[in-house]
Swiss-Prot record:
GO terms for cellular component: plasma membrane. Disulfide bonds: none annotated. It holds the Pfam family NhaB. Keywords: Antiport, Cell inner membrane, Cell membrane, Ion transport, Membrane, Sodium, Sodium transport, Transmembrane, Transmembrane helix, Transport. This is Na(+)/H(+) antiporter NhaB. Its main location: membrane. Signal peptide: none annotated. GO terms for molecular function: sodium:proton antiporter activity.
Amino acid sequence: MEISYGRALWRNFLGQSPDWYKLALIIFLIVNPLVFAVAPFVAGWLLVVEFIFTLAMALKCYPLLPGGLLAIEALLIGMTSPAHVREEIAGNLEVLLLLIFMVAGIYFMKQLLLFVFTRLLLGIRSKMLLSLAFCLAAAFLSAFLDALTVVAVVISVAVGFYGIYHRVASARPDDNDLLDDSHIEQHYREVLEQFRGFLRSLMMHAGVGTALGGVMTMVGEPQNLIIAKAAGWHFGEFFIRMAPVTVPVMVCGLLTCLLVEKYRLFGYGEPLPPTVRKVLQDFDDRSRAQRSRQEQLRLLAQAVIGVWLIVALAFHLAEVGLIGLSVIILATTFSGVTDEHAIGKAFTEALPFTALLTVFFAIVAVIIDQQLFTPVIEFVLQASPHAQLSLFYLFNGLLSSISDNVFVGTVYINEAKTALEHGVISLPQFEMLAVAINTGTNLPSVATPNGQAAFLFLLTSALAPLIRLSYGRMVWMALPYTLVLTLVGLLCVEFTLMPVTNWLLAHGWVTTPTLP
């Protein structure tokens, strides 16, 4: 029997999202104009809370849809103006170009990255050293590349290897249903469960590695570029400015990696079963023997382009997005990718998040127009300059662990910049706050998948159900890293940031720039 038009409309509205979620969004859309008519400030905060809710519920529905509806309504009822949203987008054009071109550029270097992680997985037999290598490799790559892409590559390696062993275990070489374990004997099931534990730990180490490396450079995370632009820092200076906090955090993060593996804590420590290693090694040997000269030259070209990328970023030879565009041109040229549709696939990963980031800027425009964060910032700025650093770090960390860190970082750096322009804080203090904001948004955000886009990407990937990686398990496995990274970051902001930065200034390693 054909359903009614009303029922059909309800089913179409936000698609497969739960009914309670759809109802909640409709209530938000009805309540907001009513509250705005009576108390604009309260309505503004209500909008921010609702938007954070959509980010926290990202697994129910991609936040672009509900967040976009809230932003459109905010524009319609006058909480901000299209002109102000345009100003925010124009001011952050570099970030959008980073997401569009850099992510697409790295897509064409996936073969090289797959090669690197495959060699690590099969070349290192010690689980502790392998975990450390994955964490370090992910950190290094995320300092120059997009964290989402790095995680996507590691996921590709894990899904590929899982599929190889699953087909052997099920005795069905042509079976592509990796979720079906019904044909696997008990012995193989036990080995497969061990293999899942092994892959879970590696994925989490790699995911945390992207956070450790991503906080260190201005291209590591999208919000870093926003903060760097606000502070007037180039690639090298950003790295040096962050070093008093990020270097100790990196060391402690790597030590945490070793400790949880050695003592098998929080679900870590599962080694690669010998039977699985043999199957994977045999497959890799066959693949290497069949690799043509054309494929070998493709890998070499990608390695050279990788060197160009690092050099171009380090010496700031062009804007980040333009460097990404050069990577697309060079990588496609020397990989022989000439078809428009093949090139178009590279942009599918980044564009949904780019659209979501544009919605962020609309919400930021509301925050500025309604002066929502003014009371919070005034409260923080009443504290002593030294205490301000820890308060900014903690406020950022708390919000970033439940919301998207790009959104949080953008809001707080804008508020700090406004305080500087009004003479409330000095330029040196603003620079210290920029470090506290950057580290506060990046480090505690590993607590949940909501804070780190790379974690959310992993949780929603095809790999997660295969290796039994649920939301709760991910939070549990991230817990030791969350505690260590957050506490060490706070201690560094409190005790090492000011003295080390003053030493760097005194010795000419960094200078106080003239802000735009």
